Structures are given as structure tokens and as C-alpha cells.
Amino acid sequence: MLSIDIRSDHGDLSLQVKTRIPNAITALFGPSGCGKTTLLRAIAGLTPSRGLLTFNDEVWQDESVTVPSHRRRIGFVFQDDRLFPHLTVEQNLRYGLERAQANGVEVKLTLPDVAEHFDLQTLLRRRPTTLSGGESRRVNIARAVLGQPQLLLLDEPLTGLDSQRKAEILPYLAKITRELQIPTLYVSHINDEIAQFCDNMIVMQQGELVDQGSTAEVLPRLWRESLGADRNLTEAGSLINAWVARFDPDYSMIHLQVGNQPLQVIGPTMPETSQIRLFLAAKDVAIALQPPTDLSIRNTLVATIRSITPMQDEAPGLVAVELVIDQPTEPQALSAHITAAACDALSLEAGAQVFALIKSARISSPSLFES
């Protein structure tokens, strides 16, 4: 657990953050200049700050103590590349590993394994100046991981990587951070990255924390509260956790369970019991008062209406219906955008049980969420 209660002034920015970061992957989100990088640098001990900073039972900073950056065992991936130009890729990677070994840290991640997962085997003898931007990013992340960190700070680490590389690296990062229980702060402006990779979210504005919670709670709120600088990055919708019941190869159909309710999506073969996350766009959720029959829409979830809000400013004539999926385990929120006319015609109101018709769903890689 990382506990933060710090203040720091830098030019026009006054940073003031008080929060606790769990041992999970937490997204740090906000507009440019809001203090995300400054906060990471303060946590790492690279930027002066005042206040209290503790990690687990160790005090990193208070009125009388400031633990130097190199003794905090933090893996930091900066926005710009920080590779040593006079060393080869392999020597850069060994630098992080050897520092950990010199400090008596147990080595759980080896260079061959990390190089394989980041596809660096063919780059090991090259110098950083000969690498592309995407290759440099991969080496930077790998070196941070090989340092056997007890905390990872990733400042837009996948910048410059194409979607295929991101799809390869994100599952591995998620796997090692969860298996080794490395708390991670992850700065990104990309909605899909946050949805797939992060368990929790922190939203910052003008140096302050303005929202915090699970990704499934916070990410859908960003659109409604207009906190995103670009609404294309925060499409209205919901993140739903599900698990794979079986795969039907005849139809390329994944049969899922959302709590005790079935749901089907087209997708690749996935191992049974894999935990996955779905994105359901609010515009793709319809509402019925009775179980529908003879429809091409195959997915229906029983849910209870929590609230109905007119969208007069964003989309006149529409209402945002917030629902809770009926299930015996932890409730999951679901958003639907329907016309005000349909809402009135169905006499919808808070507390009513309805049937949510899911027109489409976007699925994330199951390997990100396997326990």
C-alpha cells in the first residue's frame, strides 16, 4: 500500500494529493499539465515535495526523513527514453538486474524471460541510437521490470508502439505485476489501455485528485462529467466483468457468465473460466419491460434502474439510464442511452426491474484478468 499526503509547487502548478494506492494497477488520468508526471516524480524522490509518503511499513518521506530515490526500489519508465547510449541493449538490461542483485534483492524475473516476452532477443547487441522509438520503449520497460521493483511508475510507457505490440506487452505487464504483487501507477490518455490494464483509476485536475475508484466505476463517469479533454477517449459506456463458460467453434462464439446471467460474444478461443472484461457502449444498450423473443439481439441482462437523467446539454432528446445488473455477487453498473420518448412510453422509473438488451460488446484479452 502506497500512502500519499504531499504538496509541491512548480511554476503555475500547485500539487496537493492525499490518497492511498492499493497493491494493484492504478491508472493516473487527466489533462496535460494537471500534475500526473510531477506526482510520479515526487513519489520517486526526483522532485522536491513536502508531507508524508509511506510504502507498506516504510517511511519514504516525512518532516525528518527523506529516503533517497535509489533506495526506494522503484521502476520508473519516463515519457522520454533514458537508456545509456554507450551501452548495448543487453548491457542496459543487465544494469537494472545487477543493481537489484547488488542490493540483495531476490531475483524473480530473469533477463532471458523478460527479453523473450518483450521480443528483444534480436536487439541485445545493438546500441540505443540504432533503435526505433517503439524498440526503445520496449527496452525501457524491460529494464524497469528487471530491476525487481517493489513499485512501478509508468509514464505513458506504450507511446510509439503499434496496437499489435501493445497487445503483446500489456498482458505480460499485467501478469507479472499481479503475480508478484507489484503496485503500479500507469499514466495513459488511451481509454482502451486503461480499460484493459488497470484495476483502479485516479483522475487529476490542476494538481488535485478529483475522482478515484475502480476502473469500472470511474471510467464511465468521465464522459458524464466531461472530465476528458476529448470525449472520443471516454466514450459513454460500462465495463463489465465476466468469465468464460465455453467456446462454440461452429459460430466462433464465446459463452460468458455475468454473475449468474449468460451472455454471448463473437471472439477467439478462450480458456474456460478465464476472467475477462467487456466494454458495453451506452448507445448499444436497449431496454424492455418483458423478456424479448424472436430478435436478432441475443443478449439480455436482467437489471434494476438506479437513476434516469435527461441529457439536455450533451444530447437533447436522450436520457441516461443507470442500471445495476441483478446478480448474487458484487453489483455491476450498466449504462444505457435511450430516447426520452421511449422512456416515457415505457413509464421507466428508478427501482423498476427491466431487461437490458445488449446489441454489441467489445471484449478484452482474457490473459489480462486471469487469477
Residue ranges with predicted function:
Residues 127-131, 135:
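Conserved ABC ATPase signature
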Residues 146-150:
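A short, proline-enriched helix->beta-strand linker immediately N-terminal to the Walker B motif
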Residues 152-156:
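Catalytic Walker B motif of ABC-type/P-loop ATPase nucleotide-binding domains
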Residues 262-310, 331, 337-371:
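Glycine/charge-rich catalytic "coupling/switch" loops of P-loop NTPases
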